[in-house]
Amino acid sequence: MLKQRTIKSIVKTVGIGLHSGRKVELTLRPAAPDTGIVFSRVDLPTPVDIPASALSIGDTRLASVLQKDGARVSTVEHLMSACAGLGIDNLYVDVTAEEIPIMDGSAASFVFLIQSAGIEEQNAAKKFIKVTKPVEIRDGDKFARLDPYFGFKLKFTIDFRHPAVDKTGQELEVDFANTSYVREIARARTFGFAHEVEMMRELGLARGGSMDNAIVLDEYRILNNDGLRYDDEFVKHKMLDAIGDLYVVGHPLLASYTAYKSGHGLNNALLRELLAHEDAYEIVTFDDPKAAPTGFGFDAQTAFA
């Protein structure tokens, strides 16, 4: 059977929170089958466990924020994206602040951390959410949509009307049957505009933001001396975010995702719309790994590619 996965050993790292600017300690621990991805605020007097779930996402203005009993864990999308890309089903994430550290602004540090811990299969069938009917959410000209598809592919279009962004790819389509997440998506960094960063800092946000963890643009150009990691890094990062946003549903999706100018809020609304229609999806497993869609096999996802 196609099996669930966790990590082999405990790994730790330290980084800063993008918005708080404070030091955050992050510990990843193995978890038993059917645990899911569980975030734990270990800095609180009584630690609070917050399982990743579409219905636990609260604030989505600047990041995806998990909330439970007054406790929050913000900016979960890059770590969730890495878990999705490597096929991690079960994991405990201990964090000492209300923010996952931003690291270099991409998912690459989390991929490295998980690969350093080692990935192991568990004696339980991996569960997928198979989309059986189209589901769509619109907000003005923005939209996000899921269609039935035997695999996982995404098509994302951005439109920032900025000269530096316009010169790069505005549209990207990826099918993980023939694309390596680690090689093609994981290193794409978050990006922001200098004037917005100043405004956010005045509001007490983005205190940890810098060119070490984001692509920063002025009105005309990219300010980072080292330029871009991918020719189409902007749209690739939006896809990285979407992969993480969608993975909070609890299982990998078997679906085709199409989006235009979507963000954390629209992605979460799409998941809620899916879950509200029980006839639009089903939970499936694969007794024979060869019967599963290409790209979800252990070797395909966990290779050091």
UniProtKB/Swiss-Prot annotation:
The pathway to which it is assigned is: Glycolipid biosynthesis; lipid IV(A) biosynthesis; lipid IV(A) from (3R)-3-hydroxytetradecanoyl-[acyl-carrier-protein] and UDP-N-acetyl-alpha-D-glucosamine: step 2/6
Name the positions where Zn(2+) binds. 78, 237, 241
Give a yes or no for keyword Nuclease in this entry. no
Under Pfam families, the record lists:
LpxC
Q: Which SUPFAM superfamilies match?
A: Ribosomal protein S5 domain 2-like
**One GO molecular-function entry:** UDP-3-O-acyl-N-acetylglucosamine deacetylase activity
Q: Which cofactor does it need?
A: Zn(2+)
Enumerate the InterPro entries for this protein: Ribosomal_Su5_D2-typ_SF, UDP-acyl_GlcNac_deAcase, UDP-acyl_GlcNac_deAcase_C, UDP-acyl_N-AcGlcN_deAcase_N
Protein's GO biological process:
lipid A biosynthetic process
Q: Does the keyword Hydrolase apply?
A: yes
Keyword terms of this UniProt record = Hydrolase, Lipid A biosynthesis, Lipid biosynthesis, Lipid metabolism, Metal-binding, Zinc
Q: Which reaction does it catalyse?
A: a UDP-3-O-[(3R)-3-hydroxyacyl]-N-acetyl-alpha-D-glucosamine + H2O = a UDP-3-O-[(3R)-3-hydroxyacyl]-alpha-D-glucosamine + acetate
Q: Which GO terms describe its cellular component?
A: membrane
Enzyme class label: hydrolase
Stated role: Catalyzes the hydrolysis of UDP-3-O-myristoyl-N-acetylglucosamine to form UDP-3-O-myristoylglucosamine and acetate, the committed step in lipid A biosynthesis.
Family assignment?
Answer: Belongs to the LpxC family.
Q: This protein is called what?
A: UDP-3-O-acyl-N-acetylglucosamine deacetylase
Q: State the organism of origin.
A: Burkholderia thailandensis (strain ATCC 700388 / DSM 13276 / CCUG 48851 / CIP 106301 / E264)
